[in-house]
């Protein structure tokens, strides 16, 4: 199978989305007067900074930039990339895999219209960091006896066997850094798109703290 056919097959499920900044949570009311908890996401100007194709890059995608940046905060390579295409400087660059790169050109703006007629979305962001945590909080382990004589209130217990295999099995759930990792929440209801104010309202919570960037794309899987 050629690279082009492989990429076109993969590209069938690829879709364009938007990048926004998590503002916080609030609630709105529907026609029946029921309160709906929503997360408000603010979308800044998003511009196509590069178009990639199977012929030149091995896959089809568009690179977009958002959040204006000062020159002193960018590397020489990044500054050269923007200058080459006569673009403003952007702090955040991200790719979206698409199967129709010929429909885009450098400098195009990504509008909220990409979410028109969309009911469910997948939201990806970096979860809130919790620091170093033990197994009870990190992995929901059961605790030991809490009596006065107990010596293993919240200890993890055995982490392996003895002489055989003489090592700790890779992937063993142990204490360590919790959070601050890429998380995707799928099939969230898209409650409202306020194009006039560049706001998106999504039902429920999304990953990350207030002010952190998240990616919103139409749900690609079947949903009920």
Give the location of each predicted region.
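Extended basic (Lys/Arg/His-rich) segments that typically form rRNA-contacting surfaces
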Residues: 2-224
């Amino acid at each position: 199978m050629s690279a082009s056919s492989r990429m076109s097959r993969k590209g069938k499920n690829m879709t364009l989305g938007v990048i926004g900044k998590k503002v916080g949570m609030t609630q709105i009311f529907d026609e029946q007067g029921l309160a709906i908890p929503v997360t408000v996401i603010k979308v800044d100007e998003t511009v196509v900074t590069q178009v990639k194709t199977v012929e030149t890059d091995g896959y089809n995608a568009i690179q977009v930039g958002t959040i204006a940046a000062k020159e002193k905060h960018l590397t020489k390579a990044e500054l050269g990339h923007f200058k080459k295409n006569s673009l403003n400087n952007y702090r955040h660059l991200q790719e979206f895999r698409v199967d129709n790169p010929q429909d885009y050109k450098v400098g195009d703006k990504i509008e909220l219209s990409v979410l028109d007629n969309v009911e469910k979305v997948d939201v990806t962001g970096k979860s809130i960091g919790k620091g170093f945590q033990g197994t009870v909080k990190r992995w929901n382990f059961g605790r030991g006896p809490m009596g006065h004589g107990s010596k293993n209130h919240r200890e993890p217990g055995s982490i392996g066997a003895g002489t055989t295999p003489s090592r700790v099995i890779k992937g063993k759930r142990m204490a360590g850094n919790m959070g601050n990792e890429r998380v995707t929440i799928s099939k969230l209801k898209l409650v409202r798109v306020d194009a006039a104010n560049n706001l998106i309202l999504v039902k429920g919570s999304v990953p990350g703290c207030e002010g952190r960037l998240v990616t919103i794309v139409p749900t690609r899987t079947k949903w009920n």
